[in-house]
A protein has these predicted regions:
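DNA major-groove recognition helices of helix-turn-helix
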Residues: 15, 29-34, 49-50, 64-78, ...
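DNA-binding patch around the recognition helix
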Residues: 2-8, 66-95
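Intrinsically disordered, charged and Pro/Gly-enriched terminal/linker segments
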Residues: 22-24, 28-30, 39, 54-61, ...
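Short, flexible loop/turn motifs enriched in small residues
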Residues: 8-9, 28
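Structural motif
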Residues: 12-14, 41, 89
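Short, Lys/Arg-enriched N-terminal segment that forms or immediately precedes the first helix
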Residues: 9-22
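Short capping segments at the starts of secondary-structure elements
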Residues: 36-48
């Protein structure tokens, strides 16, 4: 059964809630911030996020607050906040959320039951998509470096999926 909230990191960032695609903020930085929080799966210091996404001449703390308010409208539900922030840290609460790349990665690593040819072909097709397509340059150098490393991980997962497909 599909979960209430789905986040797709493969291809362009997409968020689907209750079967309806959510309208993401127009700001590429806000979308990149959401993608980073979802993909990393851990809390981040506010200062680090400001450094990753905003230049110092701007007001990075205000820009972060603005972006978080826009993102909460996309992913939070009244009974289930997803963007969790305190004075020090920010993270995305992923419990009960389908995240395409995390799901594929976990299924490829699971050794208890072999995946079918159809599943492996489907995963290979998904992994052919560019991870967070269109978000290049949406943050600073640290974000671009992180994005490049994540794309390398996607490529490694694709190779593993194709390897498993070849031995079927």
């Amino acid at each position: 059964m599909p979960k209430e909230l789905q986040v797709s990191l493969l291809g362009e960032l997409r968020v689907t809630s209750a079967g309806t695609e959510a309208l993401l903020p127009a700001s590429r930085k806000a979308r990149a911030l959401l993608a980073f929080l979802v993909a990393s799966g851990r809390p981040h210091r506010r200062e680090r996020l400001c450094e990753m996404f905003w230049d110092l001449p701007d007001d990075p703390k205000a820009a972060l607050r603005w972006s978080l308010s826009k993102l909460r409208r996309v992913v939070d539900a009244p009974e289930q906040p997803r963007i969790i922030a305190d004075r020090e840290r920010v993270h995305f609460e992923a419990d009960g959320v389908d995240i395409d790349f995390r799901d594929i990665h976990a299924r490829l690593r699971r050794r208890a039951e072999p995946l079918s040819v159809a599943e492996l072909e489907s995963m290979a097709g998904q992994l052919d998509l560019v991870f967070l397509d269109g978000l290049d340059g949406a943050g600073g150098e640290a974000f671009d470096s992180w994005l490049m490393a994540e794309r390398d991980d996607v490529q490694a997962a694709r190779v593993e999926g194709l390897r498993q497909l070849a031995v079927q």
